């Protein structure tokens, strides 16, 4: 389905919907136009984590998911499916989680694990 909403309400709705897949840190985003498309993490980067010295704990799954969406949109469905499957395998196995705290995996460890699943 397609919803057309003002930015504020779209933001609220996507935040709530993202909770079904693990939170806003796991959601990719697609902005599709007639001629152009842009893919990104649902809420962009994590500058507050950088300011607090916790940048290595930023969760990269939203950017990885956006990358899979870009692959799909660009006609690389097989590669997109493999990337989506790697994300799902990582989530299902719960081997590595990025918590934003020192007790979780770093973004690099998580990304390496995703790459090993490809």
Task: List the model feature ranges, each with a label.
Residues 1-82, 86-94:
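Glycine-rich phosphate/nucleotide-binding loop
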Residues 77, 82, 86-118:
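Glycine-rich phosphate/pyrophosphate-binding loop and the adjoining helix
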């Amino acid at each position: 389905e397609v919803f057309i909403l003002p930015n504020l309400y779209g933001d609220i709705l996507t935040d709530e919907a993202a909770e079904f897949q693990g939170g806003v840190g796991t959601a990719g985003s697609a902005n599709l136009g007639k001629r152009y498309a842009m893919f990104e993490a649902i809420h962009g980067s994590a500058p507050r984590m950088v300011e607090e010295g916790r940048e290595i704990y930023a969760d990269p799954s939203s950017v990885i998911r956006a990358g899979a969406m870009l692959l799909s949109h660009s006609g690389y469905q097989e590669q997109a499916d493999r990337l989506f499957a790697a994300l799902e395998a990582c989530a299902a196995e719960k081997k590595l989680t990025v918590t934003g705290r020192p007790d979780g995996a770093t973004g690099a460890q998580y990304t390496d694990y995703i790459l090993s699943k490809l």
